[in-house]
């Protein structure tokens, strides 16, 4: 198992900064690791690669085809914890990935950027 104290960590990104990146047209890969039921409650706007952590056995072998090292990867979850853990794991798989964690997750997005996104 990974030791979080010695594992590479994703860079932190605030909801406002992510909004600026998206508004400017920056080429990003958005990865949402929440469960299907969470997406039904509060979907993240735009094109997002949905990789629920509980279903990693279904997508893990396809991961190199789904993600590229040529664009930053922003990982999203509910509060920023699962996304950070996935980001740490992803960096351990391929240090060439440029991984960012949405601090505070979809909750922060709802509070700081888009209050129309439901909170749960």
Which residue ranges define each predicted feature?
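Rhodanese-like catalytic fold shared by cysteine-dependent sulfurtransferases
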Residues: 2-29, 36-72, 81-120
């Amino acid at each position: 198992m990974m030791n979080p104290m010695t594992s590479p960590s994703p860079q932190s990104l605030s909801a406002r900064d992510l909004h600026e990146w998206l508004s400017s047209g920056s080429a990003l890969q958005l990865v949402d690791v929440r469960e299907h039921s969470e997406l039904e409650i509060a979907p993240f706007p735009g094109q997002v690669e949905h990789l629920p952590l509980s279903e990693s056995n279904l997508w893990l072998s396809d991961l190199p085809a789904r993600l590229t090292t040529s664009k930053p990867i922003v990982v999203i979850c509910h509060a920023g914890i699962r996304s950070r853990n996935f980001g740490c794991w992803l960096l351990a798989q391929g240090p060439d990935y440029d991984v960012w964690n949405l601090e505070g997750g979809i909750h922060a997005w709802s509070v700081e950027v888009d209050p129309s996104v439901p909170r749960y």
